[in-house]
Amino acid sequence: MMNKLYFYCLALFVAPTFSAFGQTQPSQDENGYYLIESAEHLKWFRDQVNASEHEQVDTNGDGQINMDDDTVVRLNAKLTADIDLGGESWTPIGEYNNGEEPDEVRFGGYFDGQGHVIKGLNVQPIDGRQSYGLFGYVAW
């Protein structure tokens, strides 16, 4: 019995520290928008977009969905606070690699800054990457 109690107490004190070291998923509003309130939330959102295998869209205009088309990720977010990225190197939301592997991913959702500021953005060249900025590749 004492071991169980010790385990539960330990879990209560240790569990909150894990989220401080990793990215945490932001909550969503009633419309499904992710509510970004920290740098960790923004990084999580970026990683969801860039790692997604969402719908493929006719991005080359030939009227068909085929291997020449890009993946378009339709996730939506709202900033709920000013974000400070602290000057660490930033990987853009959406990837354009000039047709090279890995496959290109376009951000095709809504990103509502709601008047908030993102500062401390540090964009560095990434080998094989052809796009830079907060957003690297967006769908029109």
Please state what every model-predicted region is.
Residues M1-C9:
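Bacterial N-terminal signal peptides that target proteins for export
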Residues Y8-T17:
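Bacterial N-terminal signal peptides
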Residues F21-W140:
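Surface-exposed repetitive/solenoidal architectures
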